[in-house]
Regions:
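Short, charged, amphipathic alpha-helical segments
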Residues: 42-46
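Extended, amphipathic alpha-helical stalk segments that mediate dimerization
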Residues: 1-36, 47-50, 54-124
């Protein structure tokens, strides 16, 4: 997709973002499955995740998550709960709500994160 326009990349990025959210919801639901079904569904999750990564790679895009990292202003994310955290620039990213999506030297989508120590925001 090296020759594709920015709008085509944005469409692929939006679709990938929705697929990523669906995969995360599926991953959370795995813990509720009985053991006899969990192994097969976990394999399906891993396969779908690797396919998404492979397709994004073909398009020249990457999904970036920042769970557990120190929040800094230069990260391509927006903290949803920055007002609820004492000093957001000394906070750890608790979870990624939406990943950042980047192409070659271009930010396609700014990610959304929750900082540790703030009010919990629903992921649904």
């Amino acid at each position: 997709m090296a020759n594709n326009s920015k709008s085509e990349l944005e469409i692929v990025a939006k679709y990938s973002l929705e697929m990523w959210k669906l995969l995360r919801a599926f991953e959370r639901a795995l813990s509720d499955l009985p053991d006899d079904k969990k192994q097969r569904r976990t394999a399906q999750f891993r396969y779908s995740s690797s396919r998404l990564d492979g397709l994004l790679d073909e398009a020249g895009l990457r999904l970036l998550t920042f769970d557990g990292q120190m929040f800094t202003a230069n990260l391509p994310v927006s903290p949803l709960n920055a007002d609820d955290v004492g000093d957001p620039h000394n906070a750890i990213i608790e979870s990624t709500i939406e990943p950042a999506i980047v192409g070659q030297n271009i930010l396609i989508h700014t990610g959304k994160v929750i900082l540790a120590g703030g009010v919990n925001v629903s992921r649904d």
